[in-house]
Amino acid sequence: MLVKIGTRGSKLAVVQALEAKQKLLDSFPNLSIEIVKIKTSGDKYANANLAEIGGKGLFIKEIEAELLENNIDMAVHSLKDVPAFFSWGLTIPCVLERLSPCDAFISHKHNSLESLPQQATIATSAIRRKVQLLNFRPDLNIVPLRGNVTTRLQNQSFDGIILAEAGLIRLEKHHLITEVLPPKVMLSAVGQGAICIQCRRNDVKIIDLLEKINNNMSFIGVKSERSFMKTVNGSCFTPLAALAEYVSENMLYLRCMLADGKNIYFTERTSFIEDAEKMGMDAGLELKSKCL
């Protein structure tokens, strides 16, 4: 059986697609798998502000189109790039084991975020990061930074930059990290650190394959986070964050953040994994009511 996996062409995206390929081959050694690189709008406008050109869905739109046209069988995405609502007719039956959901501070000049001098310049284009950085250090000067991970790492004109730790691990760049930021300083993006695999909702054969390699603990955790995002109708324009962590085999601890331009709000709660989705929705309703 030939399976075509669609992915963006960036180095990180290809590494993630290869990870998914290996997981499939470990479980189904007789599969023949082809990686298909697809250029997305997010790649074409690599230096533009995502919120201004249409949001993070630009990283998956063209890949979803290839899925819907039956040109590929499945698509591998960074889950944090998948918007709250994606194309009708598609589903995500699989999330691979999640790596660190944390953000990392990288600096060639300073030892930590806290030790930065007054008015230091930090580069990041994520509004979620900007809001939380200024909540931690209101004096900081936050400037935009776009491009792939390699491009961002090459830019040394700032006091520091913020990147996802998981991406650096996958690219074997973890040694460049100055400081891993704890959730109390920088709560992560929904799904950060997780790779998801998307396919057609009616493709039973592919769904069966993907369910075999799904990491159920990661799947349930990110389901709670995405439920929060859907409830607040979050997008690239919305400063939001959520992180679900296991406190026991069957209990999740969820922390969420939502900002409205004036204030930043946090909430937390714990529930059994069976109620993960409801917990995310309840958190979303609470914070949404505060932002009205």
Swiss-Prot record:
Cofactor(s) listed: dipyrromethane
Reactions performed catalytically: 4 porphobilinogen + H2O = hydroxymethylbilane + 4 NH4(+)
UniProt xrefs under InterPro entries: HemC, Porphobilin_deaminase_cofac_BS, Porphobilin_deaminase_N, Porphobilinogen_deaminase_C, Porphobilinogen_deaminase_C_sf
Pfam families: Porphobil_deam, Porphobil_deamC
Cofactor: binding details: Binds 1 dipyrromethane group covalently.
Keyword field: Porphyrin biosynthesis, Transferase
EC number: 2.5.1.61
PTM-bearing positions, type S-(dipyrrolylmethanemethyl)cysteine: C236
GO CC terms: cytoplasm
GO molecular function terms listed in the Swiss-Prot or TrEMBL record: hydroxymethylbilane synthase activity
Superkingdom per UniProt: Bacteria
GO biological process: protoporphyrinogen IX biosynthetic process
Pathway info: Porphyrin-containing compound metabolism; protoporphyrin-IX biosynthesis; coproporphyrinogen-III from 5-aminolevulinate: step 2/4
Note: The porphobilinogen subunits are added to the dipyrromethane group.
Cross-referenced HAMAP family: Porphobil_deam
Assembly behavior: Monomer.
NCBIfam families with a match to the protein in the record: hemC
Family statement drawn from the similarity comment of this UniProt entry: Belongs to the HMBS family.
Function of the protein: Tetrapolymerization of the monopyrrole PBG into the hydroxymethylbilane pre-uroporphyrinogen in several discrete steps.
PANTHER family linked to this entry: PORPHOBILINOGEN DEAMINASE
Name of the protein in its database record: Porphobilinogen deaminase
Organism encoding this protein: Wolbachia sp. subsp. Drosophila simulans (strain wRi)
